[in-house]
Regions:
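The feature marks long extracellular or luminal low-complexity segments
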Residues: 1-137
Length: 137
């Protein structure tokens, strides 16, 4: 082969390699190592619902609490562990994983009258911004 042709091919391959490396690796490394955004729960989009909001403090009447875990695009997330905390009463379930619809259901009872403030934590990392207030009388 001609030395000029070999030299041009070598320059081309080196230029192409440098361009490819600059294009691929110019982005932060965290972009390649982070979890997909679709799997990250959103503290804003996730929701808490309870029914009834007022219950008897007899230890028998249950308040059903539903937690819906969503990502930032409001898509339900499955298999996310939810831990509820309540300032009053007893949660019959705790540390439940969400179903295909992103839903986990808990039940709260109390023997003491007062106000229960309920918060939810997703995967021990993301606290849902919305909180519930349930009255036991």
């Amino acid at each position: 082969m001609d030395k000029k042709l070999v030299g041009l091919m070598l320059i081309f391959l080196l230029s192409f390699g440098l361009f490819t490396m600059a294009t691929v690796f110019n982005k932060p490394l965290t972009r390649f190592t982070r979890a997909k955004e679709e799997l990250i729960p959103s503290s804003q989009s996730s929701m808490l619902f309870a029914w009834p909001l007022t219950a008897k403090a007899d230890g028998n009447q249950q308040v059903e609490i539903n937690v819906f875990v969503r990502n930032s695009k409001n898509i339900p997330l499955e298999n996310k562990k939810i831990v509820l905390t309540s300032s009053l009463g007893t949660l019959k379930e705790n540390n439940i994983a969400t179903d295909k619809g992103g839903k986990a259901t808990f039940h709260l009872v109390s023997n003491t009258a007062g106000i229960a403030n309920v918060t939810a934590l997703i995967d021990n990392q993301v606290e849902i911004k919305q909180q519930l207030t349930i009255k036991f009388e």
